[in-house]
Amino acid sequence: MSPTGNYLNAITNRRTIYNLKPELPQGVGLDDVKRTVHVILKNTPTAFNSQVNRAVIIVGDTHKRIWDAVASAMPTAEAKKRPESCRDEAYGSVIFFTDEGPTEKLQRDFPALAAAFPTCAAHTTGAVQIQSWTALELLGLGANLQHYNDYVKSALPQDVPIAWTVQSQLVFGVPTALPEEKTFINNVINVYH
């Protein structure tokens, strides 16, 4: 296998899995999940080394309470289905944030680039989310990425800093079914000389 083979296989195998059970795979503990996310947060590059990425892992009663609040806020029975599934079928969720403080400081320190820094923060949080999702898949977990950001933020524990903006929720558990079949478009990559 080529030096990139394992990496590309991990990316290929990372899929959206909605059918979960609220368990961790045998031999995997919550500390493994925490350590994995921590290493990714620490080592994912950020603009000017601003280190804007943050994460909180919710499990147990906190997980159920937050997703119950999200489900309760949804206006229709159909809209409640996904947050109820997150609440009832997942083991936990990684809540991803960006800390707005470092981005605001960069905007003050480098006004000519001020408009670019929020985009940079968005790119780096996306990198953290996809890498975490891929790594959790390697641990034997299934996961799906949700974006109930404002609803989740309003239900978080009070000690989560106000300057942290919720970016997404990576809902995880043991997969109970294979992912749905994925179709691809032909993404041509041109090379110019």
From Swiss-Prot:
E.C. number: 1.7.1.9
The record's subcellular locations are: Cytoplasm; Nucleus
The principal location of this protein is cytoplasm
UniProt induction comment: Expression is inducced by cadmium and selenite. Expression is also induced in the presence of the mycotoxin patulin.
Q: Which reaction does it catalyse?
A: 4-(hydroxyamino)quinoline N-oxide + 2 NAD(+) + H2O = 4-nitroquinoline N-oxide + 2 NADH + 2 H(+)
SUPFAM superfamilies membership: FMN-dependent nitroreductase-like
Needs which cofactor? FMN
Q: What class of enzyme is it?
A: oxidoreductase
Q: Which UniProt keywords apply?
A: Cytoplasm, Fatty acid metabolism, Lipid metabolism, Nucleus, Oxidoreductase
A GO molecular function for this record? oxidoreductase activity, acting on NAD(P)H
Q: How is the cofactor bound?
A: Binds 1 FMN per subunit.
Q: Name one GO cellular component term.
A: nucleus
Please give the biological process terms from Gene Ontology that the record holds: cellular response to oxidative stress; fatty acid metabolic process; negative regulation of fatty acid metabolic process
Check the record and name the Gene3D superfamilies matching this protein.
Answer: NADH Oxidase
PANTHER family (UniProt xref): FATTY ACID REPRESSION MUTANT PROTEIN 2-RELATED
Its biological purpose is as follows:
Type II nitroreductase, able to reduce 4-nitroquinoline N-oxide (4-NQO) into 4-aminoquinoline-N-oxide (4-AQO) via 4-hydroxyaminoquinoline (4-HAQO), using NADH as reductant. involved in the oxidative stress response. Plays a possible role in the metal stress response. Involved in negative regulation of fatty acid metabolism.
State the similarity comment: Belongs to the nitroreductase family.
The protein depicted here goes by the name: nitroreductase FRM2
Gene giving rise to this polypeptide: FRM2
